[in-house]
């Protein structure tokens, strides 16, 4: 997943993304580091918040 790149492209901070996803900033940090992944059921919402498709979200980091 390339969440960090997509987040930066969307002009969001980790805190802003966390608020939009109803999680804490630490969760976003763990997603970006690859320590954990967002739940499958939240992929669609995350893609919408980041302004991308689910396919773009799930692509390996570039």
Q: Language-model segments: which ranges?
A:
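DNA major-groove recognition helix of helix-turn-helix/homeodomain DNA-binding modules
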Residues: 22, 41-56
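Short, small-residue-rich loop/turn micro-motifs
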Residues: 21, 25, 61
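Short amphipathic recognition helices of helix-turn-helix/homeodomain-type DNA-binding modules
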Residues: 56-62
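Short basic helix-loop element that most often maps to the first helix and adjoining turn
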Residues: 2-20, 45
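Short coil turns linking two alpha-helices in DNA-binding domains
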Residues: 13, 24-27, 39, 53
């Amino acid at each position: 997943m390339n969440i960090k790149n997509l987040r930066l492209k969307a002009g969001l901070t980790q805190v802003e993304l966390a608020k939009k996803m109803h999680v804490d900033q630490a969760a976003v940090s763990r997603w970006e580091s690859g320590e954990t992944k967002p739940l499958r059921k939240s992929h669609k919402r995350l893609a919408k918040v980041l302004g991308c498709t689910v396919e773009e979200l799930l692509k390996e980091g570039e």
